[in-house]
């Protein structure tokens, strides 16, 4: 039996639906999703296994002009997506006209590997607008195969996955056949808490936050978690905690509910808030939190 395996890397502007697409492919909620830009900070692998294939999907941060060291590290994750891909997915949304970084766009149109351009959120368009967008992207990225999809509604997602399987090279599996991702449990705890902060706080607060899980103890029925929420200033610490701890308690309750669904066990979670001044511009702290891969 012929076995296929390969890396399928997803890139695009912020908030075009990259994480929604990967979750749809994998069938699990590996990447957190919010309406805020820069929700995805790391490169996250999701693995889909079949008897004769292994598809390794990579969700990457949205492409931006970096303003500080953490964002530079995020863009390094995107650059690495060009280096090991067997198939490249360039994801755009209805109404979008260009990638925010010309250098990345040039890499796409000169790619030596198959490129699938997925025109997402077509449920928000009419037929005339859709046809105009398809013509636009055919001209801009002539080397790409174009698929109109709705990742949220699962429209055309199976068709795209079938095409990916056709394009993958013959290869043995790269990961164990029961693997779902390359990330450890603590990573998903951190991301779940960060998602709830993104959903519950406004302005700069969500972007100044990093999560570190110091304790993850699992037995047959319960997982005990101790996590620290890092912020950059004392004022941010006060906002995260809220009046009499109400805001932090709300985040903890929401995170616990999602983590119990994810792990299938009862969760006991403790969260604390600490000030870690200017961590987003500290190379030492970025390495500690898994951003700096150099």
Q: Which residues does each PLM region occupy?
A:
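Conserved G1/Walker A P-loop phosphate-binding module
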Residues: 1-76, 80-82
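Conserved glycine(s) of the Walker
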Residues: 17, 156, 247
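Active-site phosphate-binding and catalytic loops of NTP-dependent enzymes
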Residues: 31-33, 100, 172-176, 199-211
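Catalytic P-loop NTPase motifs of RecA-like helicase/translocase cores
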Residues: 40, 63-65, 97-98, 125-126, ...
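Conserved C-terminal guanine-recognition region of P-loop GTPase G domains, centered on the G4
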Residues: 52, 76-144, 217-219
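Active-site glycine-centered loops adjacent to acidic/histidine catalytic or metal-binding residues
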Residues: 59, 120, 150
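Canonical P-loop GTPase G-domain recognition
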Residues: 114, 123-181
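P-loop NTP-binding site
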Residues: 185-294
């Amino acid at each position: 039996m012929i076995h296929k395996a390969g890396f399928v890397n997803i890139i695009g502007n912020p908030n075009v639906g990259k994480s929604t697409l990967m979750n749809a492919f994998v069938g699990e909620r590996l990447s957190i999703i919010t309406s805020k830009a820069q929700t995805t900070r790391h490169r996250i692998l999701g693995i889909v296994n079949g008897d004769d294939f292994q598809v390794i999907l990579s969700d990457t941060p949205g492409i931006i002009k970096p303003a500080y060291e953490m964002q530079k590290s995020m863009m390094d994750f995107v650059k690495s997506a060009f280096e090991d891909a067997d198939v490249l997915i360039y994801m755009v949304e209805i109404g979008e006209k260009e990638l925010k970084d010309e250098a990345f766009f040039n890499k796409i149109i000169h790619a030596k590997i198959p490129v699938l351009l997925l025109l997402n959120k077509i449920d928000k368009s009419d037929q005339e607008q859709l046809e105009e967008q398809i013509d636009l992207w055919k001209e801009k990225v002539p080397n790409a195969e174009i698929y109109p999809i709705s990742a949220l509604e699962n429209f055309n997602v199976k068709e795209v996955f079938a095409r990916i399987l056709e394009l993958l090279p013959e290869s043995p599996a790269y990961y164990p056949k029961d693997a779902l991702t390359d990330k450890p449990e603590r990573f998903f705890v951190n991301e779940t808490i960060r998602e709830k902060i993104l959903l519950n706080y406004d302005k700069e607060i969500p972007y100044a936050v990093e999560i570190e899980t110091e304790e993850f103890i699992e037995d047959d029925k319960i997982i005990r978690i101790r996590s620290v929420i890092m912020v950059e200033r004392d004022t941010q610490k006060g906002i995260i905690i809220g009046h009499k701890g109400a805001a932090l308690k709300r985040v903890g309750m929401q995170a616990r509910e999602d983590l119990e669904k994810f792990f299938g066990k009862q969760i006991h979670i403790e969260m604390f808030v600490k000030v870690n001044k200017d961590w987003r511009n500290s190379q030492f702290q970025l390495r500690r939190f898994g951003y700096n891969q150099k």
